[in-house]
UniProtKB/Swiss-Prot annotation:
It catalyses: alpha-ribazole + adenosylcob(III)inamide-GDP = adenosylcob(III)alamin + GMP + H(+); alpha-ribazole 5'-phosphate + adenosylcob(III)inamide-GDP = adenosylcob(III)alamin 5'-phosphate + GMP + H(+). It comes from Mycobacterium tuberculosis (strain ATCC 25177 / H37Ra). It is found in: Cell membrane. Keywords: Cell membrane, Cobalamin biosynthesis, Magnesium, Membrane, Transferase, Transmembrane, Transmembrane helix. Its EC number is 2.7.8.26. Pfam families: CobS. This is Adenosylcobinamide-GDP ribazoletransferase. GO terms for cellular component: plasma membrane. GO terms for molecular function: adenosylcobinamide-GDP ribazoletransferase activity; cobalamin 5'-phosphate synthase activity.
Length: 249
């Protein structure tokens, strides 16, 4: 378990972990990915809090600073998936053509627009959450990683030619998925001003991420690393935006 956790940290962050190079990303590290999400979420909340002290409550600068730190710590891994997936979904043609577009090194207009939208929404939502419930930032980042576990549940195929997809797609048993969803719902209760707001936010977020992944499976023939990254970022964004909106009710 510790080796899987080390691999998950090495895969999803810039943190070097001993022995992680000998363990490829697979079932165990994917199961442990929400732990990495919790750590990243705690870091994001701390940065947002510090930014609010410097720039003032609800300042967009604190939110954008938080997003910037997350991008650095994660090497922009998931946001790159957002760009590639958006370009693939915006491509006409069969799945093979869409996958080729996703593997291309350049970013098209769909990808650029998707990245700008995700970064802007996350930054503004994080800034709002510094005044209405900073724990919601941790919850949002965690929800993205729990969504990744859900996307990799049993019977979900990998897209043809996807190295990461072939290692993680279909690896997560139903009890593991259910356990992480239960944990996410439990920790979401105190994340908002009212106990019902956090659970609603994460349910909407996880559903959005799962729906995107399901559409990508239909469009591309399976899951890729880019699809996982886009599902993570979409769930994180939807959770933060939804909770920021609900918290003002």
């Amino acid at each position: 378990m510790m080796r899987s956790l080390a691999t998950a940290f090495a895969f999803a962050t810039v943190i070097p972990t001993p022995g992680s190079a000998t363990t490829p990303m697979g079932r165990g590290p994917m199961t442990a990915l929400p732990v990495v999400g919790a750590a990243l979420g705690a870091l994001a909340a701390a940065i947002a809090w510090a930014g609010a002290q410097v720039f003032g409550p609800s300042s967009p600068l604190s939110g954008m600073l938080t997003v910037a730190v997350l991008l650095v710590v994660t090497r922009g891994l998931h946001i790159d998936g957002v760009a590639d997936t958006a370009d693939g979904l915006g491509c006409y043609g069969p799945p093979q053509r869409a996958l080729a577009v996703m593997r291309d090194g350049s970013t098209g207009p769909f990808g650029v627009a998707a990245v700008v939208l995700v970064i802007a929404l996350q930054g503004l939502a994080f800034a709002t959450l510094t005044t209405v419930g900073i724990a919601g930032i941790t919850l949002a980042v965690l929800s993205g990683r729990v969504t990744a576990v859900l996307v990799c549940r049993r019977l979900v195929p990998a897209a043809h030619g996807s190295t990461l997809g072939s290692r993680v797609a279909g690896t997560q048993p139903a009890p593991v998925v259910a356990a992480w969803l239960a944990v996410l719902l439990a920790v979401s209760v105190p994340a908002g001003p009212r106990p019902w707001q956090g659970p609603i936010a994460v349910l909407v977020a996880v559903t959005a991420g799962a729906a995107l992944a399901a559409h990508c499976v239909h469009r591309f023939g399976g899951v890729t690393g880019d699809v996982l990254g886009s599902a993570i970022e979409l769930s994180t964004t939807v959770s933060a935006v939804t909770l920021a909106g609900l918290a003002r009710l």
